[in-house]
Structure formats: structure tokens, C-alpha cells
Amino acid sequence: MELEKQKYRIYLDDVRTPVDKDWVVVRSYDEFVQKINEIGLENIDLISLDHDLGDTAMREWHYGVVKNYTINYDNITEKTGMDCTKWLVNQWLDGKPVVDVVVHSANAVGSGNMLGYLNNYRHLNRMEQNCVRVKIEHTV
């Protein structure tokens, strides 16, 4: 009888920490990539993404928001949740297992960009478009 391996949940956020201690918390793009490579996508049950992973992303969102605003990624010096999203989709394109992803970012524009990217991949591959924006209880 083979024991079922533990499935992990990855929580990407540079500031917040989820109340539920079952999440594996990563704070940056580099940590995100390292942890997923270490654990393996086949052992991950769920990924929750933040968009703004540093000061310049936060400033771009807070000070640039106007009607019909689009994020100018040229103004952001650190990698964002969008970079993590693109990396993740590239893993799927390379044949790695597709896992469920949600977005918990307060940045509505960044969230929309990530959700669109993820759900477009799923749509093009005839999968359920189940990537949604959620609120996860956190300590900060």
C-alpha cells in the first residue's frame, strides 16, 4: 500500500502572512520559483498570488490609479506576481502539472492581469477557467 504524499499550498506575498499555518509562505519571485522547484508542481494543491511584491509596485498602483488605468510595468523595478504567473504558465507549457491558482492581491488591476493570463491559458487548453480573486484571512 502506497501512502499518499502531502499536498502543499503556496502563498506568495511580501507582507501578509495567512492565519492558516498550512500555507507555505514565500515573499518574492525568487523564493516562489525556488520553493516550487523544490516541492514540485505535482505536490502542490493550490497557489495563492499577491501582485505587488515590493515598494515600486505598490507605488505604481497607489499613485497611478485613474479611470481606465493600466499598470506601467516599466516603472516597477522588482518582479511582481505577474512575473510569477508568467513563470508558472511557462512551466505548464513545458508539460508540468497544472495546479489551481487563486489571487488574493488588493491591487485590482494587477489581479485582473494575472487572472486573465491564467484563465486564458486554461481556456485555450479546454480546462475550467477557475482562477478567481479571493480573500484569505491574514495576520498583517
Regions found by a protein language model. Give the residues of each.
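Catalytic phosphate/metal-binding cores of nucleic-acid and nucleotide-processing enzymes, i.e., regions
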Residues: M1-V140
